[in-house]
């Protein structure tokens, strides 16, 4: 629909993206097709090689390139060589192969509880001294902590899934006596142009202003703080919203985090273990730069090495007919010019 609205004689269109990431849900692989360096649009393609998210010469850069090319040995060696690196020197890369006991593995629960400890400390301090804090300052601090960590799952439901992680997080919040939905990260699941909130946007639920003035928590007064726009939107007005302590790898595209946990499929033959899925997940990691000092991001992969290897040697094969249609369109244009 977008291209139908464009005046081709007066408009130049630039498409920017990563052809090696997961394609959108649905048939075909639009961006991979149009950006194929051997395809019919090759003369119109510029291949960008410098990464601004992480250092290509460090461990993460090497594992990203190797996963893109399906180089199993380089990826597996990287996990062994960089398991205990100082984050000021290089990217820590860790592989946790223990099987889930119930919905989640013991190693993941330990990792997650450690990462959740910082937001919980901020929440505890807020609950003790809420009248001394401003709503926006508190929301900004919580968002900063939540959005520095990405828990990215291959599966939406089942063992080692986004749903399992969100349920585990909720059990921790209940144990801490934190009323729902206060202080939880939430993801919007449907566009709402009236509220100007859109599918995939994540915010943090904050109590209403009265809570910061000493009143009891009132869920009807809760707001969702969206850090990208620094806006507060009433929680009850957003019809389709759900917890986002963990999201799927598909949902994470376009996002970046200083620490990333990847929950791989349990079954190597499920069809989810693909090269594009693994590459998309590992390239969500970002380094943090403060002047001349760089703190390198970390990657923890939870799953069997056999599943990682299966993913690396399984590129997605999708046929949508777009290449054929582009070739036909070019042929028609050339005949018209003659």
Task: Walk through the language-model features, giving the residues of each.
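Generic hydrophobic alpha-helical scaffold/packing signal
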Residues: 3, 35, 49, 166, ...
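Conserved helicase motor core of P-loop NTPases
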Residues: 5-11, 19-186, 192-195, 333-338
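Short alpha-helix capping/helix-loop boundary micro-motifs
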Residues: 170-177, 190, 243-249, 271
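Short glycine- and Lys/Arg-enriched binding-loop motifs that mark or flank ligand-binding interfaces
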Residues: 13, 24, 199, 250
């Amino acid at each position: 629909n977008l291209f139908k609205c464009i005046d081709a004689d007066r408009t130049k269109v630039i498409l920017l993206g990563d052809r090696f990431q997961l394609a959108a849900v649905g048939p075909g692989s639009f961006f991979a097709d149009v950006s194929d360096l051997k395809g019919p649009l090759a003369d119109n393609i510029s291949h960008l090689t410098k990464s601004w998210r992480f250092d290509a010469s460090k461990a993460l850069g090497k594992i990203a390139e190797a996963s893109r090319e399906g180089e199993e040995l380089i990826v597996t060696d990287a996990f062994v060589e960089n398991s205990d690196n100082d984050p000021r020197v290089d990217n820590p890369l860790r592989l946790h192969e223990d099987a889930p006991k119930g919905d989640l593995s013991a190693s993941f629960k330990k990792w997650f509880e450690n990462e959740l400890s910082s937001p919980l400390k901020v929440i505890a301090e807020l609950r003790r001294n809420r009248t001394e804090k401003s709503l926006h300052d508190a929301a900004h601090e919580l968002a900063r902590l939540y959005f520095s960590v990405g828990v990215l799952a291959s599966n939406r439901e089942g063992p080692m899934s986004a749903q399992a992680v969100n349920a585990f997080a909720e059990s921790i919040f209940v144990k801490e006596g934190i009323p729902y939905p206060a202080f939880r990260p939430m993801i919007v699941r449907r566009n709402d142009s009236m509220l100007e909130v859109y599918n995939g946007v994540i915010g943090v639920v904050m109590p209403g202003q009265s809570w910061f003035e000493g009143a009891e928590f009132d869920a009807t007064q809760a707001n969702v703080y969206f850090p990208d726009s620094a806006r507060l939107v009433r929680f009850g007005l957003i019809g389709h919203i759900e917890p986002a302590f963990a999201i799927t790898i598909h949902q994470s595209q376009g996002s970046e985090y200083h620490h990333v946990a990847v929950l791989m499929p349990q079954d190597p033959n499920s069809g989810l273990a693909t090269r594009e899925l693994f590459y998309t997940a590992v390239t969500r990691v970002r380094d943090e730069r403060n002047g001349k000092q760089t703190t390198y991001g970390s990657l923890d992969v939870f799953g069997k090495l056999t599943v990682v290897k299966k993913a690396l040697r399984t590129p997605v094969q999708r046929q949508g007919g777009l290449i054929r249609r582009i070739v036909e369109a070019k042929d028609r244009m050339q005949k018209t010019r003659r």
